[in-house]
Swiss-Prot record:
The chain crosses the membrane at residues 22-42. It holds the Pfam family FAM75. It comes from Rattus norvegicus (Rat). May play a role in spermatogenesis. May interact with ACTB and the syntaxin STX1A and/or STX1B. PANTHER family: ACROSOME-SPECIFIC PROTEIN (PTHR21859), SPERMATOGENESIS-ASSOCIATED PROTEIN 31A1-RELATED (PTHR21859:SF55). GO terms for biological process: cell differentiation; spermatogenesis. This is Spermatogenesis-associated protein 31.
Length: 1048
């Protein structure tokens, strides 16, 4: 060692010299360094080269394969050439980490997926290879090691455990093809025996530690069960506390995601499934050990014959982290229940999942102790048309001290479910289910079962143990053979396939056709009991909220849908809302209730989508001659035709038959072709939006005083529109009276087109059809409740002015007749029967409002008002209906201007009367009394003023009197304006809105009214009032001028 520095120094100087041997020395030195490095790293290289590429593919994370040696290799290459001290440091670090590296190599998944022989040898290298004692005698050592373990890679596993836990809990099939990230366990103390390494969906070849001392005597060709039951003492799987060999066999047959949801408070931490049972394991008898050892050896030897997919999915190691650092709550944080109820529910769910994770035949469940508990135990069942999980529940009993008998019993509280857990289940357990044969296309799974049965029989002959029942063995063999065959073919077990079939029947077509048959019929009656008896600690509101919460999770993951949701979804796929038929008048009119079909209503209620094309019309008190007409592009129904005259007052209503429906359909088609542009556009919009229009009814009344029923649209749901009739009288405003038609005649073109404009058609018993124009009701329905929409009435300005002005002398009638005539004149208006007037369009209404403002003195075409001659015989009590012409539309400003001019005329008339009484005082100034402008409007005068009116008692100006008489003579030929005086004083409207160019009216007083003929070009030639009259006309040109009381 002392010569080493000098040797290195000489080598260094030689290397730097320019001798001829420098290249040879370099080659020798490089070879020596490479050889030493190879020998140093040879153990590490062997461990990595031993794992095959196919086995390495099972690991999901490449960082597991990347070890820390590669990092040190890079550092070594960079620093060893520059500094010798770096070389020594690297060697020291490699020696310190050598032990840990060996441990990581043994823990790596690729190393354990080598082969069965390597896995077995590496696991039992320090123990006797001639016996299997490590499988049974390492209980104490494993407990000590598990107590000192800690998780060294929380980031590697913690990021994925929470994500995978939801899949484990809800039974998602993704875990069947995916694996969780491995979590390494490193002991705190330097122990030669490493701690077990836990993986999900991969095979771990840790040496056999604390394998369940209870091994199954008969193992399938696929599973060495000794490597599957690594678990800590506080978390012991209850089915493995040595039950019968059948229990252990079936427990490890199908590593399913459906099995893993049975998670307990500890299973939330690591995503694994555990039983709640924390009882200590019991040591098996020597007979069981003797029987199991040769079987385990044979199964281990035949392991390599299985496909890789089975090796990957079958060897799921169930492990957990006792800590609650990664706890995933079953319920949301804001779930409205208390902490105590939350704990109870979590325990309840965990028990249910554990009890429902395996599908054993009912014979395995039954025992002498369970027969008395059949009423309280719920078993699963399976119906061919109703896919349901046929799950058997079992829990393990306790061994007696001698270990001579195995007891099987069921949990007292089983089949509690949320969604399906909180749903319903059969009351009695299933009996007589001996064997389930599953046939898959292109797969024959009977051979593994036959071989297994033969193998089981050959071992059972050599063993003279009597603690296992023969019937139980036979039942187990049939069930286990089926599942082992499925696993050998690389298929998922029956439990997951049933869930897939339930989903595929609703959403997609399955590629694998299966047929499940029960060789024995179900003897027990299918009685259901709700979970209310089991979950008595929850109130109904909390239970309903909990069910909705679970159902939303299952629907979100599209897996494990409750059965109550599959049926409506299937119906929705078959019958969409677009193909639902239109129901119109399908029930007789005498029925007041509506019968709905279950399928359509359930689909609509479940999905919450409105069915706008289904309409049901209901009549509570149908009057005679009702017309129920629905015009829809999808279905054009027949209207109820009007009965003959002899049955006008019958209360019954006939439904439309086929000929009437066809006739009305043709009429509707014809009317749609002849519809005007504006109405046709509205109908076209209705066709595009597929909105159903509900036209009013045609009612026949004996006289005009009969009230008209009011249409009321009641909607309870969007797909149910009901129309009722009320007996309250409704006021309708009449604008046009159509000529008479036959009672059996359908609606004309104008009637159909006026529907879009809001017209309502009524039938008068004697005068024909009355067309009204109320505002169009909007049949908009709400899903939250019943909204009653009344057909509103519309009273236009024309009718208001008609009600204010009377053209007849009301003093000639009695008070009763006067009220009748007022009512009729207010609500009814007729035209000559020989003419037919089309409804006034919106454009015409706007035009009629605009033209009077532009040309107030000109008469609008179509609105001429012919003078009505005074005919005292026309206003008798026998005539109960009067023919009134349509009042020409005039603006409010023009009306106020005319009223103002009437008031001015009254003032002039009063002045003339005063001039007659005081003719002798012509030269004296006169005081004009206050005008009635501020107290009276519409040309009304108090009665006292009318009584003081007298005919002129003195000779007036001849020219003025002659022109006054001439205007009175031509009163019947000129347009006139009649104003009736009222006893109540009225306030004059704002004079600012008066029209400035109104013509001056000459006033003629009568007994109860004043007639003002419109003479634009004529003026009274009164010498005193002509100037005043011109001043008034001049002031009218200024709308802001007020009219105070004047003195002359």
């Amino acid at each position: 060692m002392e010569n080493l520095p000098s040797l290195l120094e000489s080598i260094y100087t030689t290397w730097l010299s320019l001798s001829s041997t420098i290249w040879a020395m370099d080659m020798i030195l490089a070879f020596v360094c490479g050889l030493g490095l190879y020998l140093l790293l040879l153990p590490f290289l062997e461990s990595h080269l031993s794992s095959s590429p196919s086995d390495i593919n099972f690991t999901r994370k490449p960082q597991i394969q990347m070890t820390w040696q590669s990092q040190y290799m890079k550092k070594f290459r960079n620093h060893c050439r520059n500094d010798a001290k770096a070389w020594e440091e690297c060697l020291k670090k490699l020696k310190e980490k050598e032990k840990d590296e060996l441990f990581l190599e043994e823990m790596s998944p690729g190393h354990h997926l080598n082969s069965l022989g390597n896995m077995f040898n590496s696991a039992s290298a320090k123990q006797d290879s001639t016996t299997l004692s490590p499988f049974w005698n390492l209980k104490e050592k494993s407990e000590e090691q598990m107590a000192t373990q800690k998780l060294s890679y929380p980031k590697i596993s913690g990021d994925h455990l929470q994500e995978k836990y939801d899949q484990l809990y809800w039974g998602l099939p993704s875990l069947h093809s995916e694996s969780l990230v491995a979590a390494a366990w490193i002991p705190q103390t330097t122990s030669t025996l490493p701690s077990p390494f836990f993986l999900f969906n991969v095979i771990s070849s840790v040496y056999p530690i604390h394998l369940q001392d209870k091994m199954s005597p008969v193992l399938p060709h696929t599973h060495p069960l000794s490597y599957l039951d690594l678990q800590p003492p506080p978390l012991i799987l209850s089915p493995l506390e040595f039950q019968s060999p059948a229990l252990n066999q079936v427990h490890f047959q199908s590593p399913l995601p459906v099995l893993l949801p049975s998670s307990l408070p500890y299973s939330r931490d690591s995503g694994a499934c555990y039983s709640q049972s924390q009882s200590k394991p019991h040591c098996p008898t020597t007979e069981i050990q003797y029987r199991e050892r040769p079987l385990v050896t044979k199964q281990l030897e035949s392991r390599l014959t299985l496909p890789l997919m089975v090796q990957k999915d079958a060897y799921s190691i169930l492990a957990s982290n006792p800590s609650h650092d990664w706890a995933v709550p079953i319920f949301p944080d804001n779930f409205p229940i208390s902490c105590e109820l939350r704990d109870k529910l979590e325990q309840h769910i965990q028990k249910w999942f554990i009890q429902h994770q395996w599908y054993f035949p009912p014979e395995i469940q039954e025992s002498e102790e369970v027969m008395g508990l059949q009423n309280s135990v719920t078993g699963n069942y399976q119906i061919r048309d109703q896919p349901c999980t046929s799950q058997a529940h079992m829990s393990t009993g306790e061994h007696n001290k001698q270990g001579q008998k195995v007891k099987f019993q069921l949990e007292n509280e089983s089949c509690k479910n949320l969604g399906p857990i909180l749903g319903k289940g059969p009351k009695d357990p299933v009996k007589g289910l001996e064997k389930n044969v599953v046939k898959v296309q292109g797969a024959n799974i009977l051979e593994p079962e036959r071989n297994l049965v033969k193998h089981f029989k050959s071992d059972s002959r050599n063993d003279s143990s009597n603690y296992i029942d023969e019937d139980l063995e036979n039942n187990w063999k049939a069930n286990f053979g089926t599942k082992s065959g499925q696993i050998n073919q690389g298929l998922t077990p029956l439990s997951m396939r049933q869930s897939w079939l339930a989903m595929n029947d609703s959403f997609c077509d399955t590629d694998i056709h299966m047929e499940t048959r029960n060789l024995t019929a179900i003897k027990s009656s299918e009685k259901f009991m709700c979970s209310r008896e089991k979950l008595a600690f929850l109130n109904p509101e909390t239970r309903q909220t909990l069910e909705e919460h679970v159902v939303r999770f299952w629907v979100k993951h599209r897996w494990g849908l409750p059965l109550k949701m599959l049926k409506p979804i299937n119906l929705f796929k078959l019958k969409s809302t677009e193909s639902l038929p239109l129901t119109l008048c399908t029930q007789p009119s005498s029925t007041n209730s509506v019968h709905r079909t279950n399928s359509a209503v359930e689909v609509v209620r479940f999905l919450g989508k409105p069915c706008l094309r289904q309409i049901i019309i209901k009549d509570s008190s149908p009057p005679p001659g009702n017309l129920l007409l629905v015009s829809s592009p999808s279905c054009k129904r027949a209207a109820i035709r009007r009965p003959p005259s002899g049955v006008d007052h019958e209360p019954s209503v006939a439904l439309p038959n086929k000929p009437q429906s066809a006739y009305l359909a043709e009429t509707l088609a014809y009317n749609f072709m002849e519809t005007p542009t504006q109405s046709g556009g509205v109908l076209k919009d209705e066709m595009e939006t597929e909105e159903v229009l509900l036209l009013p009814r045609m009612t026949c009344a004996p006289n005009l005083r009969a009230h008209n029923p009011q249409a009321k649209v009641v909607s309870e749901y969007p797909y149910n529109v009901e129309t009722e009739l009320t007996g309250q009288p409704q006021i309708y405003t009449t604008s046009v009276l159509l000529p008479k038609h036959s009672r059996s005649m359908p609606l004309p073109v104008d009637t159909l087109t006026s529907n879009a404009l809001g017209d309502i058609v009524m039938v008068d018993g004697g005068n024909g059809l009355v067309q009204q124009r109320p505002s169009t009701p909007k049949h908009q329905v709400s899903q939250k409740g019943q909204i009653k929409m009344l057909v509103p009435t519309y009273q236009g300005e024309d009718t208001k002015r008609q009600s204010e002005r009377k053209y007849e002398d009301m003093s000639k009638f009695s008070p009763v007749t006067e009220r009748k005539n007022n009512f009729e004149n207010q609500y009814y208006q007729t035209l000559p029967k020989t003419t037919q007037v089309l409804p006034e369009s919106l454009f015409q209404r706007l035009l009629s409002r605009f033209l009077p403002r532009v040309h107030p003195k000109k008469t609008i075409k179509g609105q001429e008002c012919h003078p009505q001659k005074d005919n005292p015989t026309a206003a008798t009590a026998q005539n109960q209906r009067r023919q009134v012409r349509k009042q020409p539309y005039m603006d409010d400003n023009v009306t106020e201007a005319q009223k103002l001019m009437t008031t001015v005329g009254q003032m002039l008339e009063k002045k003339m009367m005063q001039h007659q009484h005081h003719a002798s005082k012509v030269n004296q100034p006169r005081v004009v009394p206050p005008g009635p402008t501020s107290w009276f409007s519409h040309g009304h005068m108090p009665v006292s003023c009318l009584k003081r009116r007298r005919p002129p008692s003195y000779p007036a100006n001849s020219l003025c009197q002659r022109r006054y008489i001439q205007g009175r003579h031509n009163r019947g030929q000129l347009p006139q304006k009649s104003v009736q005086f009222s006893q109540k004083p009225q306030i004059l409207r704002n004079p600012r809105h008066m029209y400035p160019k109104s013509a001056l009216n000459v006033v003629n007083s009568s007994q109860n009214r004043t007639t003002v003929p419109r003479t634009p070009n004529q003026h009274l030639c009164c010498p005193r009032h002509c100037a005043f009259q011109r001043n008034v006309c001049r002031e009218l040109g200024h709308p802001s001028v007020a009219f105070p009381n004047r003195k002359t």
